[in-house]
């Protein structure tokens, strides 16, 4: 299971939010690239970057910071937030982004996901953010009537590399991941699942390893790393030691 550190960017700075609230931010660094480099040096094999302003404004807003981050780190980077058009997908691919995360557009413009998977095989990740099991969109400001598992089912077989599944109620709260919800979601799809939301300790990593067999192939963690309740190098070591054979693969 891969442990993936998150670098959320707002106004060019590295921040963390509580439950996606843009008004409840904590600034951890004026230099997102430096934070990403720190996580890479700790052993991260992939950095998860979110353009928070882009998610709200529906188009990239932190390209300068993201470009600098990509140039600085020597590991693959995946980017999400504000990706609504195929031209944006192409731009990020040309920029050197290893994986491009499509979230809200998967609900409103599903053809974008299909086209992106066709043009960039193995590089498209579906971002599904759930509030009480229902898909949230537009930077989590709107909740639909679509069940998270139903949205995932729409893209079975189109070549999506993975699904980033976020439990909004747990995001940034350090209350532990919602294991039953993650397991149920992973069981419902053949696509590899990367869990996000609530991870704060090594025990949480162990808990996720317990459902790895159902296709949970990675975990994204942010605030716990910045607050120091989770050591990235230790988490990576524990996750690697707990790896078991699975039919799904994040890679």
From Swiss-Prot:
Q: What are the EC numbers?
A: 5.3.1.16
Give this protein's Gene Ontology molecular function annotations: 1-(5-phosphoribosyl)-5-[(5-phosphoribosylamino)methylideneamino]imidazole-4-carboxamide isomerase activity
GO-annotated biological processes: L-histidine biosynthetic process; L-tryptophan biosynthetic process
Q: Where in the cell is it found?
A: Cytoplasm
Entry's SUPFAM superfamilies? Ribulose-phoshate binding barrel
Superkingdom, taxonomy of origin: Bacteria
Q: In which pathway does it act?
A: Amino-acid biosynthesis; L-histidine biosynthesis; L-histidine from 5-phospho-alpha-D-ribose 1-diphosphate: step 4/9
CDD domains on file: HisA (cd04732)
Q: Which UniProt keywords apply?
A: Amino-acid biosynthesis, Cytoplasm, Histidine biosynthesis, Isomerase
Which top class of enzyme applies to this chain? isomerase
Q: Tell me the InterPro entries matching this sequence.
A: Aldolase_TIM, His_biosynth, HisA_bact_arch, Isoase_HisA-like, Isoase_HisA-like_bact, RibuloseP-bd_barrel
Q: Name one GO cellular component term.
A: cytoplasm
As its record notes, the protein acts as a catalyst of: 1-(5-phospho-beta-D-ribosyl)-5-[(5-phospho-beta-D-ribosylamino)methylideneamino]imidazole-4-carboxamide = 5-[(5-phospho-1-deoxy-D-ribulos-1-ylimino)methylamino]-1-(5-phospho-beta-D-ribosyl)imidazole-4-carboxamide
What residues sit in the active site? 8, 129
- The main place the protein resides is cytoplasm
One Pfam family matching this protein: His_biosynth
Q: Which family does it belong to?
A: Belongs to the HisA/HisF family.
Q: What is this protein called?
A: 1-(5-phosphoribosyl)-5-[(5-phosphoribosylamino)methylideneamino] imidazole-4-carboxamide isomerase
Q: Which organism is it from?
A: Desulfosudis oleivorans (strain DSM 6200 / JCM 39069 / Hxd3)
Q: Which gene encodes it?
A: hisA
